[in-house]
Structure formats: C-alpha cells, structure tokens
Amino acid sequence: MLFHVKVVFGKNFIKVEGDEIIIGLTSKPLRGKANLELIRKLSKYFKVSRDSVRIVSGFKSRRKVVEVLLNNKFHSVGN
C-alpha cells in the first residue's frame, strides 16, 4: 500500500486523516534518524517487519510517500 505521510517533529503520535497519515517523531532530522524512526513506528503500527516498509519519496521532506508491504502483496491506495 502507498501512504502519504506528513511528519511533525517534537511529538509522539500517529493519526490517520483520510488517505494521509500524520505521525509525530521525537528524533531530529539528522543523518536519517527521523526516517529510521518513521519506518520503525509504521512497521509497529501495521504489525509488519521493518523490511516491509520503505520510503518511496520525500527522504528530506516532511511530506513523504511510504510503501508498506501487507500480506506479501503491494497495493495502491489513494492514487
């Protein structure tokens, strides 16, 4: 599944609004630490391995597109 993700720094939450996931991260956006926290939180939220979550676009942006492998199949949502 593809998800549009909006990142907010300094908070710790996950909220779904329509086809967008808004996620609060406590890590600073330095050297990929925030992206790693994002992958960790989304894998826990969807109950999948970290290898099943990848950032498709927006590596250096607060708005990202993230792909999550669910049930060994990729699906597209909101596109």
Where are the regions that the model predicts?
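Contiguous, often N-terminal, cationic amphipathic patches that form binding interfaces
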Residues: 1-41, 48-50, 54-59, 63-79
